[in-house]
From Swiss-Prot:
<feature type="binding site">
    <location>
        <position position="234"/>
    </location>
    <ligand>
        <name>UDP-N-acetyl-alpha-D-glucosamine</name>
    </ligand>
</feature>
<keyword id="KW-0808">Transferase</keyword>
<feature type="binding site">
    <location>
        <position position="12"/>
    </location>
    <ligand>
        <name>1D-myo-inositol 3-phosphate</name>
    </ligand>
</feature>
<feature type="binding site">
    <location>
        <position position="26"/>
    </location>
    <ligand>
        <name>UDP-N-acetyl-alpha-D-glucosamine</name>
    </ligand>
</feature>
<comment type="subunit">
    <text>Homodimer.</text>
</comment>
<feature type="binding site">
    <location>
        <position position="113"/>
    </location>
    <ligand>
        <name>1D-myo-inositol 3-phosphate</name>
    </ligand>
</feature>
<feature type="binding site">
    <location>
        <position position="309"/>
    </location>
    <ligand>
        <name>Mg(2+)</name>
    </ligand>
</feature>
<protein>
    <recommendedName>
        <fullName>D-inositol 3-phosphate glycosyltransferase</fullName>
        <ecNumber>2.4.1.250</ecNumber>
    </recommendedName>
</protein>
<feature type="binding site">
    <location>
        <position position="157"/>
    </location>
    <ligand>
        <name>1D-myo-inositol 3-phosphate</name>
    </ligand>
</feature>
<feature type="binding site">
    <location>
        <begin position="18"/>
        <end position="19"/>
    </location>
    <ligand>
        <name>UDP-N-acetyl-alpha-D-glucosamine</name>
    </ligand>
</feature>
<dbReference type="InterPro" id="IPR028098">
    <property type="entry name" value="Glyco_trans_4-like_N"/>
</dbReference>
<feature type="binding site">
    <location>
        <position position="239"/>
    </location>
    <ligand>
        <name>UDP-N-acetyl-alpha-D-glucosamine</name>
    </ligand>
</feature>
<feature type="binding site">
    <location>
        <position position="307"/>
    </location>
    <ligand>
        <name>Mg(2+)</name>
    </ligand>
</feature>
<keyword id="KW-0328">Glycosyltransferase</keyword>
<dbReference type="InterPro" id="IPR017814">
    <property type="entry name" value="Mycothiol_biosynthesis_MshA"/>
</dbReference>
<dbReference type="GO" id="GO:0000287">
    <property type="term" value="F:magnesium ion binding"/>
</dbReference>
<dbReference type="GO" id="GO:0008375">
    <property type="term" value="F:acetylglucosaminyltransferase activity"/>
</dbReference>
Amino acid sequence: MMTMRIAMISIHTSPLQQPGSGDAGGMNVYIISIARELARRGVDVDIYTRATRPSQGDVVEVESGLRVINIVAGPYEGLSKEELPTQLAAFAGGVVQFAKCHHMRYDVIHSHYWLSGQVGWLLRDLWNIPLVHTAHTLAAVKNAHRSAGDTEESEARRICEQQLVDNADILVVNTPEETNDLVRHYDANPDSVAVIAPGANVELFTPGTQRNTEQSRRCLGIPLHTKVMAFVGRLQQFKGPEVLLRAVAEMLERDPDRDMRVIMCGGPSGAAATVEHYIELTRSLGIAHRVRFLDPRPPEELVSVYQAADVVAVPSYNESFGLVAMEAQASGTPVVAARVGGLPIAVVDGETGVLVDGHDPIMWADALEQLLDDDPTRQQMGVAAVEHAANFTWAAAAEKLESVYGDAAMLDVAQCHDRYAAGSDRA
């Protein structure tokens, strides 16, 4: 059996970048994690991304069968994600040049996010191979769920996403809810959508012993016997950090002597975002002495944050799945999350955590108080959370994705030749 070779496209963020700040987040974790598992299954994966510094080198050999290829497209620094559409042609040209010079032939293209999808669409027509596309987020959904004052996604992005829905051979989504979103907002054909739940690294993210928890808290400078809430992710309005901080202020207004701490682990994302904005918010709310801000951490260190926490809060305005919620549960920590997007699948309400309707800080304070004050229920949820997370692994996700690639390759054999032979003037 011949080895399958996949060209993944992730133009706006490298899967090797530290998640939790800038444009690096759950998508980075998704791409590198599932690509590693595909490589271990014998699938060769090349991930094309835009070079952001000269020291990166053209090719990074991550492990056997997995490479990250850095393509120069525009200046290394100074371009925001919103400006990257100006470099799509340069990036596509760089991918084509690299593949030609190194005699690369691929079986399937898999693009991630709408910017990469535009490049993938072009490459599909050029290479005459099928395109699998994963949106990760959708403009129409983000706009429908955005918070007051948050920036609206552009109509140009929505149009590009519509083009990808209409032209990709297979669309991969995380949950059935995402399928519904594609059908509702983009008139997608549900038969062209494959649902593959992401996973968590359950070998790394494991429940710690009491000694692990105490050691983690000592390293973080947190008292051993206080109640701890953690927020992990980019500090941007859409992720809802302000919701959590205002909920904490509400809890302390009700009971100023409540013994608790909050860990905010992540960096700013977006042109106007700064950590100082949230630090100043804690000061204005009178809770600065209860909140500790941490820089983004690699997974090997992040597990200690999850283990140090009694509860992990995910107050996002939308999540296609919620990898932070799954990592926290794999670590044995219950989650309080917004009932949006894929979070009701990632978190089992009343069993592995609590889902909150809406983003009212008072409602969040109620939910957090109830869980923090009920030690037996919280401990029971922690045990159930580990069992639940065990059903979501990257190995299982990669097995399903490899099957999708096989289906796409068969589609190419059966249909793509006639389609392109009949009319390449469509491009």
